[in-house]
């Protein structure tokens, strides 16, 4: 994190300029600022004066908090500046206007690790969509605390690593997982029904880069076995929530949610079946939003721009 409060993210080859085709020479800027007059004009003028074409621009003003949010996707094909020059110039500009920002270059896909336990539906969905080109990322490994889903990884030809908790030593197991994540240069961790609570130290290593799917419409039915508890309460709709994982269980910023209506005729098994479908689509939407750099986190909330 820069002293002025912004972060710069690259692909695998950090801090290098890439010579890819024009179609990949794009960048996304995410901007957050106290709302003020002239802000939009100042930002767009900066890009115009430096010869950038704005391909897509979205903005939102939170009138309750007085905050302004913007997502800008730029064409870098005709950029005469180096990336370092662009970053230095925009840093000075951001300091002058007093806003925070991050910039992402699109010429390298993010590297995603999927953590699972014994349930396969979310894993299958992510791998299938990735294989079909619907999720713009690389998945170099799958990690589990059980061996049950190794056959799924084999089917998609993704390396599988089993990291069990031996004699209750969860700290050693997490250290093993973290070593794998570092070795494979992982940008995003997806908890696809990984049924272990991560330690504070783990989540702090990947702030806003761990996405969890919770099989309930948070904040209702936090923790385990939500479908049984939902049935016991006689709920008339069930849902799922994807959120960034933090030190507090199921309390991280919410990215995506969905629900379906049910009736008294649905038993716990039927609720679980319906819920599995909701979980898949909610997790996929959240992961896609992160990969496409459409999320700005603000406190315990998120601003998620549409596609």
Model-derived regions: residue spans:
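N-terminal amphipathic/basic-hydrophobic helices that include classical n-h-c signal peptides
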Residues: 1-23
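A conserved regulatory-domain signal marking ACT and ACT-like small-molecule sensing domains
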Residues: 20-110
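Short, glycine-rich nucleotide/cofactor-binding loops
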Residues: 112-121
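Histidine-anchored nucleotide/phosphate-binding helix
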Residues: 121-132
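Short internal beta-strands
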Residues: 137-148
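Donor/substrate-binding cores of folate-linked one-carbon enzymes
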Residues: 146, 169-175, 184-307
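Adenosine-nucleotide cofactor-binding segment
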Residues: 154, 158-184
């Amino acid at each position: 994190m820069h002293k002025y409060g912004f972060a710069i993210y690259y692909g695998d080859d950090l801090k290098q300029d890439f010579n890819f085709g024009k179609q990949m020479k794009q960048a996304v800027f995410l901007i957050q600022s106290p709302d003020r007059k002239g802000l939009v004009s100042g930002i767009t003028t900066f890009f115009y004066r430096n010869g950038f074409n704005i391909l897509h621009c979205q903005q939102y003003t939170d009138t309750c908090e007085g905050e302004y949010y913007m997502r800008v996707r730029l064409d870098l094909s005709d950029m005469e500046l180096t990336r370092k020059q662009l970053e230095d110039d925009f840093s000075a500009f951001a300091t002058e206007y007093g806003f925070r920002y991050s910039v992402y270059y699109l010429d390298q896909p993010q590297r995603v690790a999927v953590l699972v336990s014994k349930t396969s539906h979310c894993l299958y969905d992510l791998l299938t969509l990735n294989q079909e080109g619907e999720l713009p990322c690389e998945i170099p490994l799958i990690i589990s605390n059980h061996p049950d889903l190794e056959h799924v990884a084999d089917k998609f030809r993704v390396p599988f690593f089993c990291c069990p908790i031996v004699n209750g030593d969860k700290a050693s197991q997490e250290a093993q997982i973290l070593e794998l994540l570092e070795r494979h240069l992982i940008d995003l961790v997806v908890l696809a029904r990984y049924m272990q609570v991560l330690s504070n130290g783990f989540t702090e290593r990947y702030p806003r880069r761990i996405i969890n799917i919770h099989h309930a419409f948070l904040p209702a039915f936090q923790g385990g076995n939500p479908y049984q508890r939902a049935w016991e309460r006689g709920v008339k709709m069930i849902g799922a929530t994807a959120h960034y994982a933090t030190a507090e269980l199921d309390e991280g910023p919410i990215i995506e949610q969905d629900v379906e209506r049910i009736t008294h005729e649905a038993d716990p098994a039927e609720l679980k079946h319906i819920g599995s479908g909701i979980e898949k689509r909610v997790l996929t939407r959240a992961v896609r939003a992160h990969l496409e750099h459409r999320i700005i986190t603000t406190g315990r909330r998120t601003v998620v721009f549409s596609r």
